[in-house]
Amino acid sequence: MTDANLGIEQTKQLAASLFNRTWELIDKAERTEAEELEMIHSAHASRLHWQSVGGPQRWAIGEWQCARVYCEVGFPESAIFHAQACLEIVETNELPVWMHASVFEVLARSYWAAEDLDLAKLARGRALQLIPKIEDEAERNTIADQVAQLTF
């Protein structure tokens, strides 16, 4: 649902801006409690706006970002919930292979945050199997770098 006063392009711009703001906060080395709360809200707001103007790929990316945020702030149950929502979207739509690798990366990260190393290793292994199949070098490198952060 979007604000009735916003058009499609404005809603897309708002969703993208919120997504980018969330990334700024994720990348910040030290965050205040207020910034962590902002990070949660901006990820959810971005996901909400993409629901009305995006498609399955945008929805999956939004769920992926929500899961990543919850890993960052130490709420593994919420991270797993959003990672599984991402997986559902990816598996029920014809999305590129990098999306499949990405969802397994965030599942691994979420299970790691929950201290379930068996499931974390399983998900990381699946991501590692998919990375060589990603055709675009930049996408392949981005996901490989994210998986490399999983040092359990």
Q: Which residue stretches match the model-derived regions?
A:
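Amphipathic alpha-helical segments of tetratricopeptide repeats
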Residues: 3-4, 23-24, 43-51, 84-92, ...
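"A position-specific structural signal for the A-helix of alpha-solenoid helical repeats
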Residues: 20, 65, 99, 106, ...
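Residue signature of alpha-solenoid helical repeat architecture, marking inter-repeat boundaries
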Residues: 9-17, 37, 57, 98, ...
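Residue-level signature for tetratricopeptide repeat
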Residues: 24, 49, 69, 103, ...
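TPR repeat positional signature
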Residues: 11, 18, 25, 42-43, ...
